[in-house]
């Protein structure tokens, strides 16, 4: 496995899952290395000295950090199969815009839903539902955010679906009631082997979130 790309990751991380999905969508074999956040590996600290976070993709001895950056790198490093971006500049710009929306609006809100309580949780739930509705509107009647093909925005968002059950359990609401098209989209994405092999079982995520809440709230 010496010549394979190395992915430094942590199993429940929706950001790490993005890298897994991207690599598998391209058919790239890689070495998966699980990180222990209480004892980060020398390779992680050396590869990402600024943020010291996963995911990090080490390819040809060079580290690529930050999940969306990793996804874009994978698309450019292995261009032969399943392009993640449209061919036109406007389409690519729109894809980057919506992936950025997921990172800036969706990420913070979803954490408040499962990782907070009281007023902060309720505020997060409101933000989450608003973000979900905006994303559903952008999806429209398309099979994927990229149109007919699974792409960059889909990869940026689908990994959160492994957490949907945890959001519903701890936030006490139904995502499908709020956004049926988004749930249908998530099920469509899960039919792809690159996605189904990369996302952990939702019950494991619920147990992980419950343990976090027990220890931190």
From Swiss-Prot:
Enzyme class label:
transferase
The record's tissue-specificity note reads: Mostly associated with vascular tissues, especially near hydathodes.
Q: Where is the GST C-terminal domain?
A: 88-208
Cellular localisation: Nucleus; Cytoplasm, Cytosol
Q: Describe activity control.
A: Activated by JAR1/FIN219.
**A Gene Ontology CC term for this entry?**
cytoplasm
InterPro entries named among the record's database cross-references: Glutathione-S-Trfase_C-like, Glutathione-S-Trfase_C_sf, Glutathione_S-Trfase, Glutathione_S-Trfase_N, GST_C_Tau, Omega/Tau-like, Thioredoxin-like_sf
- Transferase as a keyword of this entry, yes or no, is yes
Coarse class of the primary localization is: nucleus
State a single Pfam family of this protein: GST_N
Q: Which UniProt keywords apply?
A: Cytoplasm, Detoxification, Growth regulation, Nucleus, Transferase
Disruption outcome:
Hyposensitive hypocotyl phenotype under continuous far red (cFR) light and a delayed flowering phenotype under long-day conditions.
> PROSITE patterns, per this entry?
GST_CTER, GST_NTER
Q: Note the subunit structure.
A: Homodimerization. Interacts with JAR1/FIN219 under continuous far red (cFR) light to stimulate JAR1/FIN219 activity and substrate selectivity.
Family affiliation = Belongs to the GST superfamily. Tau family.
Protein name stated in the entry: Glutathione S-transferase U20
Q: Which gene carries the instructions for this protein?
A: GSTU20
